């Protein structure tokens, strides 16, 4: 099953609305409130009934997470030797590097997005009868800007999980609220991946609100019309003096 971005947004809206009512109660209905970031750990464990744990998943850090749809065994290679990870239905295993003391803060955004990605796979699995042949899913490392050519069903599955994961972490209604406070709902501007100082402060504020990386925030903001992306060469350093 291949879903459009519009359909993915509709799924996210329905899921988040239901979760917010149960988790935030009457606060979710307050029209004057600030944005409510999704507490993804509670969303995974309390709302989706997923069991989240941490293990070393690869020697080179190339696998961020695994999730299981049925009881299964997954083979991984760590330090040159093969070993098995036994997964129960609804298990999620994230790489243990996320909880190493020096990484807890540094990789917080990546950990949250990886968990949201695995949550999205579980939600999509319930909607997609074609996926019932699959026992588990792994999330590999994504380099660069995270874009990929969508050729296979697996490519589409990954794109859909990334899109739904982003919409769960940064729901459009909550992004609208945040951007009203941060920049009066006006779009930010970036040049490649660079921002002028004032917009850099604003996107960093956005990242702090939603607990996401700058790249994840930029992709989501651009998707929702809150970021204008220009070419690198259009950037002009405000401190640069021209002769």
Give short role names for the model-derived ranges.
Residues 1-243:
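Active-site hotspot residues in diverse enzymes, especially metal/ion-binding acidic/histidine motifs
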């Amino acid at each position: 099953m291949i879903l459009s971005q519009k359909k993915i947004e509709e799924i996210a809206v329905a899921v988040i609305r239901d979760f917010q009512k149960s988790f935030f109660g009457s606060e979710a209905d307050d029209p004057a409130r600030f944005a409510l970031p999704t507490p993804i750990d509670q969303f995974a464990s309390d709302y989706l009934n997923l069991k989240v744990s941490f293990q070393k998943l690869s020697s080179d850090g190339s696998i961020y997470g695994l999730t299981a749809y049925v009881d299964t065994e997954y083979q991984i290679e760590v330090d040159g030797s093969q070993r098995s990870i036994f997964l129960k239905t609804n298990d999620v295993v994230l790489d243990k590097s996320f909880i190493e003391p020096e990484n807890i803060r540094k990789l917080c955004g990546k950990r949250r997005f990886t968990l949201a990605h695995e949550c999205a796979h579980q939600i999509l699995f319930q909607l997609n009868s074609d996926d019932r042949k699959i026992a588990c899913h792994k999330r590999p490392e994504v380099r660069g800007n995270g874009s990929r050519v969508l050729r296979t069903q697996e490519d589409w599955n990954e794109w859909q999980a990334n899109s739904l994961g982003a919409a769960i972490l940064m729901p459009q209604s909550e992004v609208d609220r945040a951007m009203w406070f941060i920049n009066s709902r006006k779009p930010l501007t970036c040049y490649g991946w660079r921002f002028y100082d004032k917009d850099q402060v604003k996107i960093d504020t956005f990242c702090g609100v939603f607990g996401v990386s700058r790249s994840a925030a930029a992709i989501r903001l651009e998707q929702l019309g809150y970021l204008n992306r220009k070419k690198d060469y259009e950037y002009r350093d405000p401190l640069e003096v021209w002769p």
